[in-house]
């Protein structure tokens, strides 16, 4: 193998890796269940799953892999794939915030606005100071400081306290 051929091979590999790093697969839960994961993980560096339902969120939170979609999401995380889950706003008051906040997942609402799941017992100014928009979901026993509430209002961040 001469130097030119080797150079072309290296350039092609670098090009494919760069395309993969910029690529996101957007799937529904049904499409994810039917997807070929090895091929999907080889072609995409991030995975966006649209409108996750509450039972699937519960399985993810409890690390259950009985459902094919939950198993594939856990596999994606194990492979280092960035996973973004889109949730319907009506689910926010009832999702398992503490358990889901521990997972390396990114959450958005159905409109693509960022969701921050805060599992701590106190939401302080520091927790909302760097956020620019979106929603912060806190569990029902979480104390929200006055400064955090003012900072959230100033930045158009909606605070959602669970029931």
Swiss-Prot record:
Gene Ontology CC terms: propanediol degradation polyhedral organelle
InterPro entries: PduM
Upregulating conditions: BMC production is induced by growth on 1,2-PD vitamin B12 medium.
Reported consequences of knocking out the gene: Impaired for BMC assembly, with a disrupted, unstable BMC shell.
Keyword Repressor tagged: no
Keyword Protease: no
Subcellular location per the Swiss-Prot or TrEMBL entry: Bacterial microcompartment
Main subcellular location: other
One annotated GO biological process: positive regulation of organelle assembly
Pathway linked to the protein: Polyol metabolism; 1,2-propanediol degradation
Molecular function GO terms recorded: structural molecule activity
Keywords: Bacterial microcompartment
Coiled-coil spans in chain: none
TM annotation in the entry: none
NCBIfam families for the chain: microcomp_PduM, PRK15428.1
Known role: Plays an essential role in assembly and/or stability of the bacterial microcompartment (BMC) dedicated to 1,2-propanediol (1,2-PD) degradation. Overexpression impairs BMC formation.
Note from the entry: Bacterial microcompartments (BMC) 100-200 nm in cross section are formed during aerobic growth on minimal 1,2-PD-B12 or anaerobic growth on 1,2-PD-tetrathionate medium, but not during aerobic growth on glucose, anerobic growth on glucose or pyruvate-tetrathionate. BMCs can constitute up to 10% of total cell protein.
Similarity remark: Belongs to the PduM family.
Subunit field text: Interacts with shell protein PduK.
The name this protein goes by in its record: Bacterial microcompartment assembly protein PduM
Gene: pduM
């Amino acid at each position: 193998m001469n130097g030119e051929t080797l150079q072309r091979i290296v350039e092609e590999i670098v090009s494919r890796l760069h395309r993969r790093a910029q690529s996101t697969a957007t799937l529904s839960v049904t499409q994810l269940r039917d997807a070929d994961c090895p091929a999907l993980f080889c072609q995409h560096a991030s995975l966006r799953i649209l409108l996750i339902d509450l039972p699937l969120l519960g399985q993810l939170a409890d690390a259950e892999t009985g459902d094919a979609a939950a198993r594939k999401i856990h596999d994606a995380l194990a492979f280092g794939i960035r996973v973004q889950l889109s949730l319907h706003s009506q689910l926010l008051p009832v999702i398992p915030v503490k358990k889901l906040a521990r997972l390396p997942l990114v959450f958005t609402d159905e409109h693509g606005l960022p969701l921050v799941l805060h599992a701590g017992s106190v939401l302080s100014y520091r927790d909302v100071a760097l956020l620019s928009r979106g929603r912060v979901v806190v569990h029902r026993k979480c104390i929200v400081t006055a400064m955090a509430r003012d900072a959230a209002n100033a930045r158009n961040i909606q605070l959602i306290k669970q029931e």
